[in-house]
Amino acid sequence: MEFKYILVMVTAPTREVGQQIINMLIEKKLAACVNMISPVNSCYLWKGKSYEEEEVLLVVKTRAELFEDEIVPAVKDIHPYDVPEIIALPILMGSQSYLDWIGEMTER
């Protein structure tokens, strides 16, 4: 099944970095809306060691067709992590007017 709209989740080390990513996504019309949730506690493994960090979580509403070729490279270009979290989940259902708005705001 193919999905038209997705939620993209991106973690960032600080609110400032998160805001830079938000501004870029909105300016380039790669996202209709981005929520910043702060702080979030992240526990992860990196190079054989366990870490616990405070981060911010961005929740991006966008079109699925923009993910791989545009959103991922654009976020990687400005993200300070070697391997940033950039994952997408399909929007299975939603208010049709909201979904239409996502489409309109990301149309170029």
Roles of regions detected by a PLM:
Residues 1-108:
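Positively charged, small/polar-rich N-terminal and surface patches that mediate targeting and assembly
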